Amino acid sequence: MDYFPMIIALLFVAFQGAPETAVLGAELSPEAESQGETPSPHASWRPRRSKRCSCSSLMDKECVYFCHLDIIWVNTPEHIVPYGLGSPSRSRRSLKDLFPAKAADRRDRCQCASQKDKKCWSFCQAGKEIGRDQDTMEKRWDNQKKGTDCSKLGEKCIHRQLVMGRKIRRLEAISNSIKTSFHIAKLKAELYRDKKVTHNRTH
């Protein structure tokens, strides 16, 4: 009989707490429903960034770094050094859909995604001559690949072909380095997303 008062006290506390828990459950259920409707910010947030501009030629390394990877360039006496890699995630949407008329115009070095981006427009407008030289280089590259018979043209033609061969090899090296940079940026983006997902699951 010593346990009887204790059992009654426990039953009283249990029945007293039941309405409170029911009320708390009713108060929490709308919050749970509202949380279920709206996704959490961690799940929906992704570090995506659209291209700043679209280059006329992917062989223009400085333009590709500026438009696609948003890298700052430092002019040194020996060469141009890129640094400050921005967000690796980028949109693959072509700017031809946004500017169909301007995309066909290859006189500019690049086409900006936003007309309000004055820095981008000045960069693309200032690079008109570089873009023209790049187009000329591409045409020469195609002609070099097709081959030219220098047997009748003499030593100047042979010398020109040797110089063009060196330039072509250099441009191929630049193109390969750009492809490697894009591949590394893509791998970094995938690694970042995987780390973000695992971090959200653990917490």
Curated annotation (Swiss-Prot):
Sorted alphabetically, which InterPro entries does this protein's record hold? Endothelin, Endothelin_toxin_CS, Endothln-like_toxin
Q: Which Gene Ontology terms describe the biological processes this protein takes part in? A: endothelin receptor signaling pathway; intracellular calcium ion homeostasis; positive regulation of protein localization to nucleus; positive regulation of smooth muscle contraction; regulation of systemic arterial blood pressure by endothelin; regulation of vasoconstriction; vein smooth muscle contraction
Q: Where in the cell is it found?
A: Secreted
User: Which is a Pfam family this sequence falls into?
Assistant: Endothelin
Signal peptide from the UniProt entry = 1-25
Question: In terms of one coarse class, where is the protein primarily found?
Answer: secreted
Which species is this UniProt entry from?
A: Sus scrofa
In Swiss-Prot or TrEMBL terms, this protein is called: Endothelin-1
**List of glycosylated residues:** 200
Which portions of the sequence form the region Endothelin-like? 110-124
In which family does this protein belong, per the annotation?
Belongs to the endothelin/sarafotoxin family.
Instruction: Site (Cleavage): give the residues.
Output: 73-74
What does the protein in this record do?
Endothelins are endothelium-derived vasoconstrictor peptides. Probable ligand for G-protein coupled receptors EDNRA and EDNRB which activates PTK2B, BCAR1, BCAR3 and, GTPases RAP1 and RHOA cascade in glomerular mesangial cells. Also binds the DEAR/FBXW7-AS1 receptor. Promotes mesenteric arterial wall remodeling via activation of ROCK signaling and subsequent colocalization of NFATC3 with F-actin filaments. NFATC3 then translocates to the nucleus where it subsequently promotes the transcription of the smooth muscle hypertrophy and differentiation marker ACTA2.
Q: Which GO terms describe its molecular function?
A: endothelin A receptor binding; endothelin B receptor binding; hormone activity
Q: Which residues form the propeptide?
A: 26-50, 83-203
Which UniProt keywords are present, listed alphabetically? Cleavage on pair of basic residues, Disulfide bond, Glycoprotein, Secreted, Signal, Vasoactive, Vasoconstrictor
**Annotated segments matching region Disordered:** 27-48
Could you state one GO cellular component term attached to this entry?
extracellular space
Disulfide bonds, paired cysteine numbers: 53-67, 55-63
